[in-house]
Amino acid sequence: MFPVNSTGTGTSKMTFDEFRLSSTAPAPPAGLSLALAGLWWDAKGDWKRAHESAQEEAGLEGAWVHAYLHRKEGDQDNAAYWYARAGKPVCREPFDAEWITIVKSLLHRNS
């Protein structure tokens, strides 16, 4: 559906609205980074798959998504650990707002 960018780590020219609308599909768009796939699965309500994707992404992006997921789960101590690993302050925004912030940031980085 969306081509992989030259680094093979994300989508090419995918907008936020396209990403959000893609969550009606049965599977994530081809070429998503593991961090974005985690957020895609979270939008589908599948925390387990979201967490698995975040765990597979070894970098800062995966740590950020991992932090968000543990905060959403209610595991604040684990979330704080992952925010620190991601180099981000612990988020206090509503979950929807944080999800939007992370998705937009990762789409921008991976375009």
Feature-to-residue mapping (PLM):
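TPR/TPR-like (Sel1-like) alpha-helical repeat modules
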Residues: 58-59, 74-93
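N-terminal amphipathic/basic-hydrophobic helices that include classical n-h-c signal peptides
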Residues: 1-13, 36
